[in-house]
Regions:
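Short amphipathic alpha-helix that is part of the acyltransferase structural core
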Residues: 1-33, 125, 134-164
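Short loop/turn motifs at secondary-structure junctions and domain boundaries
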Residues: 36-42
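Conserved beta-strand in the GNAT
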Residues: 47, 53-61, 68-74
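A conserved beta-turn-beta hairpin within the catalytic core of GNAT-like acetyltransferases
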Residues: 62-70, 80, 122
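Conserved GNAT acetyl-CoA-binding A-motif
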Residues: 70, 95-108
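Conserved acetyl-CoA-binding loop-helix of GNAT-fold acetyltransferases
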Residues: 75, 81-94
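Conserved catalytic-core motifs of GNAT/GCN5-like acyltransferases
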Residues: 99-105, 120-134
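Conserved active-site tyrosine of GNAT-family acetyltransferases
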Residues: 114-119
Length: 164
């Protein structure tokens, strides 16, 4: 029997799994990136499923009518080359069809694929991270000011706070 393909909104309990896929692909998802995407656009983070089991993901965030963003586009390796990624990609583009400009976080080895869809390389983004010490230089430098900062989980940030 043929498996049923579907695309649906990501659930909260699927976020850790999709984050682990991103890390396996060599992406550097920030802490709570997916929750922040989900909080910014409640309709913009999807999983592709076979018989309701997630096999792929895409974040497609509509910030406003002028700008949207696509990232987290992943199909698990064992399900690639079956057209599932194309269907997920087309779903995302359809969602952003009335947006003036779409930004894209692209895997370097897929740049040619994205150019075939009309995307042009604009810039390279590097994400830096520090592994290790609890005694970070920034914390020492701003030790007296740290009490004025409040750190909150990404899914607790209101959509009004992140709208352009």
């Amino acid at each position: 029997m043929r498996e049923k393909f579907s695309i649906r909104l990501i659930s909260l309990d699927e976020i850790p799994e999709v984050t682990s896929w991103a890390m396996l692909e060599g992406f550097s998802p920030g802490m709570d990136d997916i929750s922040i995407y989900r909080n910014t656009d409640k309709q913009g983070v999807w999983v592709a499923c076979l018989d309701n089991n997630p096999i792929g993901s895409i974040a497609c965030i509509k910030y406003n009518s002028s700008y949207g963003f696509i990232g987290l586009f992943i199909v698990k390796k064992e399900f690639r080359n079956n057209g599932y990624g194309v269907r997920l990609w087309e779903h995302a583009l359809d969602y952003l069809k009335n947006v003036d400009c779409i930004g894209l976080e692209a895997a370097p080895d897929r740049l040619n694929d994205y150019s075939k869809w009309g995307f042009r390389k604009s810039s390279i983004t590097n994400r830096w991270k520090l592994n290790g010490s609890k005694d970070l230089p920034l914390r020492n430098f701003y030790k007296d000011q740290f009490h004025s900062f409040k750190v909150v989980p990404g899914n607790k940030i209101s959509s009004e706070a992140v709208l352009i």
